[in-house]
A protein has these predicted regions:
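Ribonuclease/tRNase effector modules and their secretory precursors
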Residues: 2-127
Length: 127
């Protein structure tokens, strides 16, 4: 017997995450940044510790709003810099690292979590 809570639980598939990544690449390409999601990021998007599941619209929103507010500033940072993308309205936190691949920066999302009062020593970019 299928339980209602199992039907409501909406996991983000790897295919959906790839589509989100392609969409965000088009936005961030304007400042020379390629968005990358790791396997761990995918696993953590669907982690039950998030309480409320993280959905694709929330991921798009945080990256799009961070781009609008800080895109040019982030594109001027140096290779290897770690930073935290933070959405205050959804409590979503995305620690990322910038890596130069020879032609553009890769913004590699190491993980993602929904957590109030997330602590990090890296520079925070909040929306």
């Amino acid at each position: 017997m299928i339980k209602l809570k199992d039907l409501i639980k909406e996991e983000v598939s790897m295919s959906q995450l790839n589509q989100v990544e392609k969409y965000l690449d088009k936005i961030w390409a304007k400042v020379g940044i390629d968005v990358e999601f790791t396997r761990h990021f995918h696993d953590r998007v669907n982690d039950e510790r998030n309480k409320k599941p993280i959905n694709t619209a929330e991921l798009i929103r945080i990256y799009r709003e961070i781009y609008k507010k800080y895109g040019k500033q982030i594109s001027q940072l140096s290779n290897g810099v770690e930073l935290l993308l933070k959405d205050m309205s959804t409590d979503i936190n995305v620690p990322v690292v910038l890596k130069w691949d020879g032609k553009e920066f890769d913004m590699i999302a190491k993980t993602v979590m929904r957590k109030k009062n997330f602590k990090s020593r890296t520079k925070k970019y909040s929306v």
